[in-house]
Amino acid sequence: LRHDDIHLANATGEGNLVVLFGARTGGDGIGGASILASETFEDGMPAKRPSVQVGDPFMEKVLIECCLDLFEADVVQGIQDLGAAGISCATSELASNGDSGMHVDLENVLLRDPTLTAGEILMSESQERMMAIVTPQDRERFFEIIDKWDVEAAVIGHLTGDGRLTIDHYGHRIVDVDPKTVAHEGPVYDRPYARPAWQDELQAATSESLARPATREELIADVRAVLSDVNQASKAWVTDQYDRYVQ
């Protein structure tokens, strides 16, 4: 991809369409520690289980080739992948970068799991999804290329001139914010900090001032202490237990 063919994550042009394409939206990446901290696991309650997002290499390859075709046809005004925080992140960053407003109708999102709530749809981290800004004039050509690669897509919103990010779910307004406050002007922590006293002592130490093992047993003990330190020891007992196929 030539540098002059790079498309940025900017949403500009009032009336332009917001298109979500690629894989369908599921429950991937929702919950995590907040679910484990919940005390509500009663029968009859909605299932509370985190779902680890698992990539699909074939779908990823198809989506890459599809995007390259879209770029070559010059039917994309702006584009962004969906990663952490999913739709909530992509919409706010696109609108903020382009100094634009955006309206989204969340019910138009293609779902893999129809039981997802509005909040879950917004925060889903399902892989292999892209969000593009397309002019109404390029809509037909855009979807021709999408269909050629057998990729699913849906128009979920449009750009506005009011500078607000608004998101509705079946007529109910669930988001109405300035996108910059979400994407780039969020709260910044001003945490107290100080230089640790032990750093001065450590940096002042020399090879002559450090204790050295005098016997074989002391040397073995020192080596074992280093190897058993949590920063040095094998992490396999944790990583080998992690099930990345949790559904």
Where are these regions (language model features)?
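Glycine/proline-enriched, intrinsically flexible loops and inter-domain linkers
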Residues: 1-247
